[in-house]
Every structure is written in C-alpha cells, then in structure tokens.
C-alpha cells in the first residue's frame, strides 16, 4: 500500500517510521513545509517533500496529521488532484461528518487517533469510520495493527480516545518523571533512576497486557501486610493520586470538546 502523510510533525513522523520499521510492503511519503528536520527519513526508505501533492496521485491512502486550522487549506490544495483516495484523519476534533462535508462526501474517510509510540510499534491507535467505508478502512486497520493495537470504536468516543491514548502518553511520562525525581531523592543518580522507573512501568504494562487481569489483582501480588508498598500507595491516595489523574483526563476532554 502506498501511504501519503501530510504533516511531518512528531505524529506524522512517528507513523512514517513505524510503517517503515514494522509494516511490510508499504511505500511512504511524508510532506512538511520545512523538510530540513525530516530529511533523515530517507535513510528508512521514506520519501520526503515540501509539496503536499508530491506522489499523492499514486497513493492509496492520504493520512492527515496536521493542525485543525490547516485542514481547509490542505484539502483545497489536494482535492483537485486526488480521486477515490481514502482520507484518514488524525486531526483532533475533526469529526467524520465534518470531514465528509469538507470533501463533499466524495471520498472514503476514516478517523484515526494514533500516538507517538507508533515509531516503536507500540501505539494504541483508535479507529472509526462510516459503515459504508468498511472495506476502505480495513487495510488501514491492518496497517495500524502493525504499529501496536488498533481497536475500532464508536466515533462518539474518539475525543475520549485522544485523551486516553494520545494525551495519555504524556501522563505516563509525567509519572515516570516523578518516580525518577523520587529516585534521585532517595539516593540514585538521574540516569539510573530513570532506567529503573521506565523499566518498571514497561514491566507492569507487559504483565497487564499479557495476563489480561484487572490492575488491582497485580497490585495485590506486590503488596504485603504492613509492607512498604501498601503504605506508599495509601500515602499517594491520601494526596489525591488517582483522583488527580482522573480529573486531569476529564479536563483534557473538556478542552477538546470546547
């Protein structure tokens, strides 16, 4: 499949690298106004250009990883030269109905919400699409399954998916940073503290994904009566650990919905 990504920022580049590394038999083009910072992608067999229309007529799918305010300008530029291309949008807040309206209901459309872990084959990419475009969406679902997981969800949950899956990357990293800072305070150098904190989160996530149990069941394995784990957890909860995370996620969702 030939994939044309418009928007060579962090997300677009992550998707391109993920496809190049983990998905077979695909050709990728990435466009960006200033290509100096993405020239290195050519080392992975990825074509780069500052022209959004470069190679686009050969593409099977066009992926939009641009800002909301850029959508109208980009569509005005590319629609005259693409025919029957599937348009997959990763634009925050752009509904399928809005995208169909902007494209005069003439193109198959899919809504995707990957995250920047795509370049490591670890993205949680939520996908939604109109039922009539199921066949068009199928290869896109397969593509993003190569880059991690790709659950198909009801579009009404896409804003929530943005917060949980995309913003969630930053939330997880902030937890790791806090653990790193605590590690320094209790005696580790910064590099060692970071390595321990990051690997611990990776291990916890791997256990959860492979055993497919509720997180609390795994927590119970770590905690012992009067042990150091339970007193630490209780202290965190007394200071609003879970509630602050929940409030943060809900606040992010409110920001998206305006």
Residue ranges with predicted function:
Residues 1-50, 54-56, 122-123, 184-185:
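NAD(P)+-binding Rossmann beta1-loop-alpha1 motif at the extreme N-terminus of oxidoreductases
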Residues 4-6, 23, 48-50, 55-58, ...:
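Non-catalytic terminal and connector segments of soluble metabolic enzymes
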Residues 15, 35-38, 44, 50-127:
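Rossmann-like NAD(P)(H) cofactor-binding subdomain of soluble oxidoreductases
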Residues 28, 38, 55, 71, ...:
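Small-residue helix-packing motif on alpha-helices
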Residues 98-108, 124-160, 171-210, 255:
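Internal alpha-helical scaffold of NAD(P)-dependent oxidoreductase catalytic cores
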Residues 109, 158-163, 215-219:
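Short pre-catalytic strand/loop immediately N-terminal to key active-site residues, enriched for Gly-Thr
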Residues 198-258:
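NAD(P)-dependent Rossmann-like dehydrogenase/reductase catalytic/cofactor-binding core
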């Amino acid at each position: 499949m030939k994939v044309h990504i418009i928007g060579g920022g962090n997300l677009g580049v992550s998707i391109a690298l993920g496809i190049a590394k983990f998905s077979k038999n695909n050709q990728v083009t990435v466009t960006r106004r200033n290509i100096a910072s993405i020239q290195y992608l050519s080392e992975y067999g990825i074509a780069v250009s500052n022209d959004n229309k470069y190679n686009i007529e050969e593409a099977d799918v066009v992926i939009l990883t641009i800002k909301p305010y850029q959508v109208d300008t980009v569509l005005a530029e590319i629609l005259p030269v693409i025919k029957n291309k599937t348009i997959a949008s990763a634009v925050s807040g752009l509904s399928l109905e809005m995208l169909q309206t902007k494209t005069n209901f003439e193109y198959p459309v899919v809504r995707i919400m990957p995250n920047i872990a795509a370049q490591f084959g670890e993205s949680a990419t939520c996908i939604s699409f109109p039922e009539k475009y199921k066949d068009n969406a199928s290869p896109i679902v397969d593509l993003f399954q190569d880059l991690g997981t790709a659950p198909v969800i009801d579009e009404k949950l896409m804003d929530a998916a943005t917060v949980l899956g995309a913003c969630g990357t930053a939330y997880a990293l902030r937890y790791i940073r806090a653990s790193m800072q605590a590690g320094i305070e209790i005696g580790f150098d910064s590099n060692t503290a970071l390595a321990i904190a990051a690997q611990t989160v990776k291990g916890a996530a791997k256990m959860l994904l492979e055993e497919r149990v509720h997180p609390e069941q795994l927590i119970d394995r770590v905690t012992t009566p009067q042990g150091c784990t339970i007193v630490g957890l209780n202290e965190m909860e007394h200071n609003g650990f879970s509630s602050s995370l929940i409030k943060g996620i809900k606040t992010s969702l409110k920001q998206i919905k305006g």
